[in-house]
Design a protein with these regions (language model features):
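Short, well-ordered alpha-helical microsegments
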Residues: 18-23, 123
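Short amphipathic alpha-helical "interface-anchor" segments enriched in bulky aromatics
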Residues: 123-154
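A short, flexible helix-boundary coil/loop motif
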Residues: 46-102, 145-153, 158, 165-231
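Short, surface-exposed basic-aromatic patches at helix termini and helix-loop junctions that form
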Residues: 22-32
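Short His-Asn-centered micro-motif
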Residues: 12-16, 35-37, 91, 104, ...
Length: 231
C-alpha cells in the first residue's frame, strides 16, 4: 500500500464495491474511493447547522431523484456530457458517512450516482476519475481479443511477465498507429489493415518481382483497405 500511496491515494471501483466493508478497509490503508452507487441507494442531504444543544444531525431529508432540491446542489457544465449533472455533499447510508456525490440525469430521465469519499474533490474530478476505469478495462479487453494476452502457456514467472508485457506493448503500439493516422479507435480495423497489408506484401514477395510502387500505390491501398470497406 505504501508504494501505491506514493502514486495516488484514490481507488476507482464499480458499484459492486460501494459498501461500508470495502470502504472501511480502503480507508484504514489510507485510500479514498471513487465509485458509483446503485440506482436505489439511500442518500440524504446534509442538514444545515443549527444553534441548539446536543449532537448535530448527521443527515437531513432523503434525496428524491425524481424531485431534486436544486438549491442544495451545484450544476456541473462538462463538455460532451449528455443530460445534466449536479454535485453536492450527501450522507450515504450504505457507507455510513458523508461523500462528494454527483447526480447525472441522462436525457431519458434516468439518474446515475457517482461519488468520492474524498470530499475535497470537485464533481467534475469525480466523473473524470471514474471514467478512467473504463480505459483500463478496454486495455484488458483489447489485449485478450487482439494481442494474445491469454495465449501464453508458460509456467515460469519471467516468461509470463515477458508475454504479458509484449501483449500490452503491441496494443500501445497499435493505439499510437491509430492516433498518428487519424483512424477510428478500433483494434478490429487495425488488425484487418495489418493482415491485408501483410497478405499483399506476401503476394508480391512470392511472385519475386519488384513492381513500380508509384503505379500500383492506389491499387495496394485499395487491397489493404478492402476488408474494412466490405464490412
Amino acid at each position: 500500500s505504501k508504494k501505491l500511496l506514493s502514486i495516488t491515494d484514490i481507488v476507482v471501483a464499480d458499484a459492486f464495491f460501494s459498501t461500508s466493508t470495502f470502504e472501511k478497509g480502503m480507508s484504514e490503508l489510507g485510500f479514498y474511493i471513487v465509485s458509483r452507487f446503485r440506482d436505489n441507494a439511500c442518500l440524504h442531504y446534509i442538514p444545515k447547522k443549527e444553534k441548539r444543544r446536543g449532537r448535530p444531525r448527521v443527515k437531513g431529508d432523503k434525496i428524491d431523484l425524481a424531485n431534486l432540491n436544486l438549491s442544495c446542489m451545484e450544476e456541473l457544465h462538462i463538455d460532451g456530457l449528455d443530460g445534466k449533472a449536479y454535485t453536492l455533499k450527501a450522507y450515504a447510508k450504505a457507507l455510513k458517512k458523508t461523500v462528494r456525490l454527483v447526480i447525472w440525469r441522462m436525457p431519458g430521465g434516468k439518474c446515475k450516482l457517482f461519488f468520492s469519499t474524498k470530499l475535497s474533490m470537485t464533481g467534475e474530478e469525480v466523473l473524470k476519475t471514474y471514467r478512467t476505469r473504463f480505459q483500463i478495462e478496454f486495455c484488458y479487453r483489447d489485449s485478450k481479443q487482439f494481442t494474445g494476452l491469454m495465449d501464453c502457456q508458460a509456467r515460469h514467472k519471467r516468461q509470463l511477465d515477458f508475454a504479458f508485457n509484449a501483449s500490452f506493448a503491441s496494443l500501445n503500439a497499435a493505439k499510437v498507429f491509430i492516433k498518428d493516422n487519424g483512424m477510428d479507435n478500433s483494434m478490429a480495423k487495425v488488425k484487418s489493415l495489418m493482415f491485408n497489408a501483410n497478405y499483399t506484401k506476401l503476394i508480391f514477395d512470392m511472385s519475386r518481382c519488384r513492381p513500380n510502387r508509384t503505379l500500383i500505390s492506389k491499387i495496394v491501398k485499395e487491397l489493404i483497405g478492402w476488408q474494412p470497406k466490405a464490412a
